[in-house]
C-alpha cells in the first residue's frame, strides 16, 4: 500500500518534557493503529553566552550562561486518506509546555 510519512520534530530546553511529549505522540499513534519510528534523538544544540559581571570595570571577571536545545524526531507511516486526521489530532493534543513541534508531511 502507498503510505505517506509524517515527520514530527520536537524541540525543548528540558529533556524530560521532550521525552514526555514524544511518548504522548507515540501513544496517540498506537491508538490510531499507525506505524511509528522513533523517538530518534537528534543532536543537541548548545549556546553559550558570556557577559561581564560588572558593567564598567574588571574585564577579567566574566560569567557564562548556557542553553541547550534538545531535539527528537518521530516518524509516522500513514495512509493518505488518514493524513489530515492524524495531523489534526497531533496538533490538538495537549503537549507539555515548553515543547515546540514541527510537522512535515512527505
Swiss-Prot record:
Keywords: Ribonucleoprotein, Ribosomal protein. Pfam families: Ribosomal_S10 (PF00338). InterPro entries: Ribosomal_uS10, Ribosomal_uS10_CS, Ribosomal_uS10_dom, Ribosomal_uS10_dom_sf. GO terms for molecular function: structural constituent of ribosome; tRNA binding. Gene3D superfamilies: Ribosomal protein S10 domain. PANTHER family: 30S RIBOSOMAL PROTEIN S10 FAMILY MEMBER. It comes from the Bacteria. The keyword Ribosomal protein applies. GO terms for cellular component: ribonucleoprotein complex; ribosome. It comes from Mesomycoplasma hyopneumoniae (strain 232) (Mycoplasma hyopneumoniae). Belongs to the universal ribosomal protein uS10 family. SMART domains: Ribosomal_S10. Involved in the binding of tRNA to the ribosomes. Part of the 30S ribosomal subunit. This is Small ribosomal subunit protein uS10. GO terms for biological process: translation.
